[in-house]
Amino acid sequence: MERREEQPGAAGAGAAPALDFTVENVEKALHQLYYDPNIENKNLAQKWLMQAQVSPQAWHFSWQLLQPDKVPEIQYFGASALHIKISRYWSDIPTDQYESLKAQLFTQITRFASGSKIVLTRLCVALASLALSMMPDAWPCAVADMVRLFQAEDSPVDGQGRCLALLELLTVLPEEFQTSRLPQYRKGLVRTSLAVECGAVFPLLEQLLQQPSSPSCVRQKVLKCFSSWVQLEVPLQDCEALIQAAFAALQDSELFDSSVEAIVNAISQPDAQRYVNTLLKLIPLVLGLQEQLRQAVQNGDMETSHGICRIAVALGENHSRALLDQVEHWQSFLALVNMIMFCTGIPGHYPVNETTSSLTLTFWYTLQDDILSFEAEKQAVYQQVYRPVYFQLVDVLLHKAQFPSDEEYGFWSSDEKEQFRIYRVDISDTLMYVYEMLGAELLSNLYDKLGRLLTSSEEPYSWQHTEALLYGFQSIAETIDVNYSDVVPGLIGLIPRISISNVQLADTVMFTIGALSEWLADHPVMINSVLPLVLHALGNPELSVSSVSTLKKICRECKYDLPPYAANIVAVSQDVLMKQIHKTSQCMWLMQALGFLLSALQVEEILKNLHSLISPYIQQLEKLAEEIPNPSNKLAIVHILGLLSNLFTTLDISHHEDDHEGPELRKLPVPQGPNPVVVVLQQVFQLIQKVLSKWLNDAQVVEAVCAIFEKSVKTLLDDFAPMVPQLCEMLGRMYSTIPQASALDLTRQLVHIFAHEPAHFPPIEALFLLVTSVTLTLFQQGPRDHPDIVDSFMQLLAQALKRKPDLFLCERLDVKAVFQCAVLALKFPEAPTVKASCGFFTELLPRCGEVESVGKVVQEDGRMLLIAVLEAIGGQASRSLMDCFADILFALNKHCFSLLSMWIKEALQPPGFPSARLSPEQKDTFSQQILRERVNKRRVKEMVKEFTLLCRGLHGTDYTADY
């Protein structure tokens, strides 16, 4: 078959291949791909074959690769190449060759009907692609023609083979449509055409499915074909007969999975809710599966119960609103709801004995939303019917959330335990949501059950039952304000009565107390009921996460009521810290808890507690500072510094972030004298410097030191002022010796908080000039090895311009060198560094008028900046960064318009810049668009996105849709 040759480069293959795209070379490359043990050779072969598939020669070798004497792998490649040529390069096929191409594909499909199935499928996909490209004008009755041609009696292939080939073709046609690259307007036309053609497909499918003589393989294929077609949003009423046939096929174990898929796909179409009469006919069909469902559950047949549950949930979840509206059919819908309830409460533990119940959870959200969306009168009626259902749901969910016996749980794999944990979180979310429907009565219900369980003397209760009820409370209290609930005092009273003999139960008790910490803040008299439990649990490593996080919540929420317990809390915490019971992260949380606790004490008390709390660590740090650096003492140093920084993160006597009401703040006198954190920092400052002197070349230790001061600065704000001069001096020495990003980040914090204060400007200016000078030297030596430093440096410069532009007025600051280094940073491969550099320029350019040195350097070197930006847009930088470069263009246009209008024309003049794919007209249009837009930043971003796609040859491709 003749083919018009494609233009060179149409395939996008890049440089000319070393080998010609011939049948022989393709076969050799395929052999290399499948059988060569060398991975590099495989990759080369794959790359070459991808080029071959899109080459003009593919039209010639594809047909030859389909010859009967070739092995299936080679035939498959030939069929795939045909599909790629037809689907991606349709415009290269002359219209007068459509018919011969169609005929050849039909011939090949007929031949492969009794051959390799994978090759047959690829050929069917190729013909489907051709049909979609020709419909509706060039091939108006494509589907009907396919059916007619394959039903012809004169075919050499047996009837069953032809039937299966036709069904394969009809199955892949809608699938190919869903993934096709058809333009949007064509997609609409073809969808309409396919909807009409459905009339040629469904009668055939019905006939084949209902014929007793149809073999199982044919009926299986019919169901898959139906499943594929319903996703074209075929009207549900047109599918009635096939859906009923699919329900009947559920009794056949071989057809069960395909039937489920077909029914679920048909029911789940968004358009299906319009066909209420059909939906109502489906309810009895679904309810008719209940006996099969019960049998499956009884026999442990998880596949069958899972499939039937999917069908029930698909109908209920997708159409609850439409079915609720049919008031006269309320009983049949309620029966469906109860069937789904059975699926939610299916016996056994998830995920070991069953995997079905999790499918139903979203249904309960949907049903509740739909009920609550009705107007008040109608809602009241439905609430009357469905509130008892939702109370039953709570019981079912809490039963499903119960842990298995300790013995059984011990046999579960770690993966099964993790799946069960996630399942319980999903149940927790559902319970929290159900609270909206049931309100305070739900908490009363849970409390009554727990009370009866704990006070009953008749029978011993299982810890699992207690744990599940507490878990229900915790789920609701964590996210919903229960402060006005009248059952919480009783619950707090019940908690100490729980006999805790199990880690899971103890964990849930802890998390429940934590969830009630805000309530405890409003009812401080109850703190003493639960605090001893929490402090006792701190000593158990198995309860590490729950006990520490609960103590942290109590200390944060109730700190003004904790002074009477402070000594005990500090003593217990010190004890567990010294015994090293907890992992590092929990130790850090514990220090944060103590920071909250100490914040509410008198200054003298804080200092006393701080002394006893951190003295052992200071002594340990003094000892470590004398030792020769090694990996083990490094870990100890980082741990101690981490403990201090976490303590100082939350120790805030000025209550900057406090949202408590005035009366509670008045409990504390206004603090006099220096801040306790500053007192401690000044005491340990020399020691920290000593540690630093030995560990200056270790980024982790430097980072840990900087973290102490950075977190203290963020918490203390102005109270940190006494430390500013000595910290600036220390940072300067640190950074001069070995530059580290963390030192720059801390400098940025100091600039942000203190640079605007005249008293602190001199030391901060000196530090700023020093780190700038050191970093500029680093740029001369090779900054590419330090993207983190460059990133932090750019952020520091931007902060300086934003907070205190006067820092750029100093004659000792080489603004020109800073500007050039920032331009260089724009070309880094690391996205965060590029982003930070763009941020610097968007802060710098608006200062052109007010800071003389900035205006001068922009005038001299601004063209260099523009070229770097255009190079990035032209393809040098990631497309995800285009908004950042657009911000620079916008700033240039807004603040340096006359310069930009001259530079942009000059910069875009050279052919091939910033991309060889651009025409002079496209470049001219872009420059005019940019220069015109000085107000709307969003429009500039859109222009840049459009232009970068043109530069990269991606405009009008599939990439554009996701961009």
From Swiss-Prot:
One of its GO terms (biological process) is protein import into nucleus. It comes from the Eukaryota. HEAT repeats lie at residues 24-54, 56-88, 95-135, 142-179, 194-231, 236-268, 276-325, 330-372, 375-438, 440-476, 487-522, 524-558, 562-600, 603-648, 676-716, 720-754, 761-803, 815-845, 860-893, 897-931. Its main location: cytoplasm. Residues 45-111 form the Importin N-terminal domain. GO terms for molecular function: small GTPase binding. One of its GO terms (cellular component) is cytoplasm. It is found in: Cytoplasm; Nucleus. The keyword Transport applies. It holds the Pfam family TPR_TNPO3_IPO13_4th. SUPFAM superfamilies: ARM repeat. Keywords: Cytoplasm, Nucleus, Protein transport, Repeat, Transport. The keyword Transport applies. Expressed in fetal brain, heart, intestine and kidney. SMART domains: IBN_N. Belongs to the importin beta family. Interacts with UBC9, RAN, RBM8A, eIF-1A and PAX6. Functions in nuclear protein import as nuclear transport receptor. Serves as receptor for nuclear localization signals (NLS) in cargo substrates. Is thought to mediate docking of the importin/substrate complex to the nuclear pore complex (NPC) through binding to nucleoporin and the complex is subsequently translocated through the pore by an energy requiring, Ran-dependent mechanism. At the nucleoplasmic side of the NPC, Ran binds to the importin, the importin/substrate complex dissociates and importin is re-exported from the nucleus to the cytoplasm where GTP hydrolysis releases Ran. This is Importin-13. It comes from Homo sapiens. The gene is IPO13.
